[in-house]
Amino acid sequence: MMLERIEAIERITGVLEDELVICNLGFPSRELYSIRDSPRHFYMLGSMGMASSIGLGLALSQERRVVVLDGDGSILMNLGGLVTAAAQSPGNLIIVLLDNRCYATTGSQCTYADVIDLGAVAESMGFNVIRFADDLNFEQALAMDGPVFAHVPVKPGNADVPVIDLDAEEIIERFIKEVRGATED
């Protein structure tokens, strides 16, 4: 049975240890924050379509594994970001496509994800692709060589969660401190 997006986020982050997480804007970030807040999580508050590009830059800047929680609408807005990530081929990057086939944050308008196989697109670019169906065993993605593209179909809709009560400066300052602390060891 297809998971709610918040359930998928909970299962994915539940098996992470010290990985850095970049989360797509809007409800995905709010859902992650409500499940498990951490200085290792960068909550996007704007810049739709840029989560994977930010994750790529972070992955290239240090050795720690980077997990990007992105949506189909966001990825479709910036396919060039996937091309660049594949060309740079960082072994520590996992892009998770939480595919609900809509722009849930802006009113659930349909995307073209139901007619375009984004996993096949990512594979054609050079990603190691894993597709999850009913069983989201994210340890499988963590065991793969990167860059990894993990396709996770989820139900449309948003969980009823509060807004993030951190301002943008707090989010970035604590995230930078976390990244710098790991790279200075």
From Swiss-Prot:
Heterododecamer composed of 6 subunits alpha and 6 subunits beta. It is an enzyme of class 4 (lyase). This is Sulfopyruvate decarboxylase subunit beta. Binds 1 thiamine pyrophosphate per subunit. Its cofactor is thiamine diphosphate. Keywords: Coenzyme M biosynthesis, Decarboxylase, Lyase, Thiamine pyrophosphate. Belongs to the TPP enzyme family. It comes from the Archaea. Pathway: Cofactor biosynthesis; coenzyme M biosynthesis; sulfoacetaldehyde from phosphoenolpyruvate and sulfite: step 4/4. Disulfide bonds: none annotated.
